[in-house]
């Protein structure tokens, strides 16, 4: 479930940057949970030297540990390296080199969707857990230059 159950639908007090964050509840009993945004503009992720996808997330200590992932174009899935990322109670930045998606076959000049999910994508046989996550500041960046 994306958004709060009551108005306002976006989170206004528990944010990393700006004035709102996206709450995302997951319930993975014999399934996985995800939110997808279909892109109609800004689909060329090779322009201006962009090389990284960055997002900030925050969980709740009582969350059931679940794998966190990002998928592009509905197929290429990159998992966070911490299997209990859903239990991190401090805002945590996750930077994904876009080359990881390219290595999985994504045409970065034509990104049609981005998905943020929890659990094992495609799983319909293993019991999972529940929890509440917050997502903020999803952005593309050029590579960082070492000082």
Residue ranges and their predicted role:
Residues 8-34:
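Short carbohydrate-recognition loop motifs
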Residues 26-105, 110, 121, 125-134, ...:
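Extracellular ligand-binding interfaces
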